[in-house]
């Protein structure tokens, strides 16, 4: 698995398509995490199960910004962070993309 992260609208998907054209892409994975949280499912467990079925996938997830005022939004930020840490740990390679430039960080 390859994990690509970075801020919103920084060119992560274009970078992934250019660098890994043969791989299945899962862009905006933070929205999958949000769905799992809303359904009361553990997003790390759901991600682990997905990776078992798709070990060669490229997962693209935006970093989430400042700490929000609402408690439910803070919970989501925390869960996205936990999933990001899990993905980085499990990934063969990790890239951070800024302004369309990917930097390998693992």
Locate the predicted segments by residue.
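Short, basic, glycine/proline-bearing loop/turn elements
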Residues: 2, 33-37, 66-69
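Conserved substrate/cofactor phosphate-moiety recognition/catalytic segment
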Residues: 17-41
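Glycine-rich P-loop/Walker A and Walker A-like loops and their local beta1-loop-alpha1 context
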Residues: 1-24
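Structural motif
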Residues: 3, 25-27, 58-60
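Glycine-rich nucleotide phosphate-binding loop and flanking beta-alpha elements
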Residues: 10-11, 32, 102
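Active-site donor-binding loop signature of nucleotide-sugar glycosyltransferases
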Residues: 6, 28, 99
